[in-house]
Amino acid sequence: MASGTATATLSLARYRVTFEAIEPLALLEYLGSTLRGAFGHAFRELCCPARPGEACPMPAACAYHLVFETAPPPDSPALRTHEEIPRPFVIAPPPASADEYRRGDHVVFDLTLIGRAREFLPHFVVTLREVDGLGRGRRRVRLAKIEAVDPLREVSETVFVGDEALVRPVDLGVTFDECAAVRSPGAAIRVAFLTQTRLKHDAGFVRRPDFHVLFRRLLGRLSSLARFHCGAPLDLDFRGLIERAQAVRLVSDDTRWTAWTRYSSRQDRRMEWTGLVGSATYEGDLAVFWPYLLFGQWTHVGKGATFGLGSYRVEGAE
């Protein structure tokens, strides 16, 4: 199992956000990308001093750039192995979110802030209050509630209620080391892929979720998040962990490759989202991997994790 000093930097906080539809609204695109677009636009307007079309004069201190356009130091050696730096947040709508909402219906999603992004909670709350339209025609919505959620202990506290001005600075943070203290379920686990999971290996996306591929992509994501957003790189035997992952067997594969098409208002064209959904069962010496898998449930894994793809749930299978 990873030592505390090796992984102590990894931390996150999770929030449940509820919007109320003031008028009926229809979503032509995946809810995660809709929310990310509306949220990013409002965040930039509120938090970045640059005018539209201009470069930010102080990107190293700008909350928008640190969260949405993360850039490494110019001399960062990590650029050689990281094609894209992950953003320190995840917008995760329910896997079966609706396409249409009536007046009074709730649009609910989870927002995970990772590492230093937790310090920007006030910026996120103010931005969410400014999101006043979603979907086709930007139908009116209002922020109804934000709750801090501890997914490890299954408790929650109110951060904001729509008819109040008070914002409570609640952070029910979860650390990697707290996940490492949770007992491994045994020699068999089941991973349920809840949203399209896009695992890239050997220059292509895999359609068979071999454990070593899943773990490689998860370890790479956690390593990047630690390096760029949590203050320090992970001090781990990466090669040794991957070699051990190759010994874990895929004993049941109930996944399928799925695709669905949604309109992208940002790109003004239809986009196809593809990936694995379903479940896979693995057997082997799994104890060392358990905390990574547990923590990774809230960071997601694979391409598109920032707006909700790569969501999974892990549990014992014995």
Q: How should these model regions be labeled?
A:
Residues M1-E318:
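RNA-interacting cores
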